Amino acid sequence: ANADRFEELAAEVTQSMLTYDSAWQFPATLLTVALLPAVCEEFAFRGVIQPLVAKWTNNIHAAVWMAAFLFSAIHLQFHGFLPRMVLGAGLGYLVIYSNSLWPAIAAHFFNNAGAIFMAAIYGPEWVAQEMNAAPEWAASDYGIAAVSLFVGIYLVRWVRKTGTWPKHHPVH
């Protein structure tokens, strides 16, 4: 019952953030819903929590999945818990393989920005439908995930091509 109430509140907040009354609200939303969370959450979860757990457990996989679990839990949207946790793990491994937070920040930004653009294109009804469609993924979720995956793969390849991979990494 409490989880459902959190979902309802999250839907209301999300819908209000993604409904625009003036032109300046769209760039403000990109800043507050896409850029700031991407930077702050990646620094917190992949920059602080993940390395701490790796140090405590001496297991990078445990660190990635623990940070991903906490990343998903902190959003308090339980119907989308598993997809968000998998996204968090993907971002965690992106940090490990690139040896940088920036590809994960970029992928996180594009994931969030994709949802903002979809809301701007399809309107508040789309937001309400998407928020109430949980736990199944809608077609747009797959689209956003595919774009995010493409951007993530591109960034990893770019980082690898520029030679910034750590020498001790098993890819070498």
What label would you give each PLM region?
Residues 40-66, 93-100:
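Membrane-interface helix/loop boundary segments of multi-pass membrane proteins
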